[in-house]
Amino acid sequence: MLIENDYTVISAGTERANLVALPNTGTCPGGYSGREKGGFPFWPGYCGAGRIVKLGREVEAFRPGDRVIVSWGGHRTHSVKKAAELVRIDDERIDTLDASFAHIASFAFLGVRKLRLEVGESVMIAGQGILGVFALQFAALSGAIPLFASDFDPARRKLALELGATAAFVPDETLAERVMAATGGAGVNAAVEVTGSAKALQQALEYIAWEGRISLLGCTRISDVPIDFYKYVHRRGITLIGAHTSTRAKTESAPGRWTEQDDYRTFLKLVAAGRLKI
């Protein structure tokens, strides 16, 4: 189907990483693109929403003019997608601009779902960019309390508090000490590492509780911090969980592994109900 894109969402971290060809990107030599030499062409953008303008002859579930969520479409005026890849935006209460964030929000869904949170567990969301803002809200909806956030930007910390964080910390060298103090010395039960910084992962390992879980939502592309895995992971029974979108279920949702389309539908329901702030 041919879709005219009304909005596409910028994923600053991923797009910048590819533009400067950081390790473990599609543009670096030997990266996940499979191109031995890496480099360009590179088509940034993977998240948006638009309207169907033309259908394939055998498509029955959609009509021209339907609003749809567009994933992996790039920053371009039009995209060509298969019917199975699309989710229609039926609820008129949902603005198309808000709906355009569904795909990137699904990454945060995955990062939180993989933690298998239980009501009453303490959680840290490390990083309050676009993914962190969604992860914070999803953790709150999952019953996390106390719920902490960390970011260097004071405006982001202020927003985190407005969105329900119990406390928001500056991730400096005293972060682990302050989180431990805020949890009575126990540490948090679970954490979502959103920054993609190996230093932030080291911090998380210092403030996570014994047998805690850390979901790696941000892309830790550069391993520039040595980690004592015996001290911080093995001996303390810590679970590190890869939460890249490539690990999600493809056709049928399961606990902790929902399909993209099911996460889109959940996102739309939360937006329509006023339970998620964009």
Regions found by a protein language model. Name each.
Residues 158-241:
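Glycine-rich cofactor phosphate-binding loops and adjacent beta1-alpha1 units
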Residues 93, 97-173, 177:
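Mid-domain Rossmann-like dinucleotide-binding core that forms the NAD(H)/NADP(H) cofactor-binding site
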Residues 1-10, 20-74:
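Glycine-rich beta-strand-centered segment in the early N-terminal region that forms part
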Residues 185, 227-278:
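C-terminal substrate-binding/catalytic core of Rossmann-like NAD(P)-dependent dehydrogenases/reductases
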Residues 62-63, 117, 208:
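Short, well-ordered loop/turn sites that connect or cap secondary structure elements
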Residues 79-92, 143-145:
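Short, compositionally biased
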Residues 41, 78, 124, 128, ...:
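Glycine- and other small-residue-rich loops at beta-strand/loop junctions that grip anionic moieties
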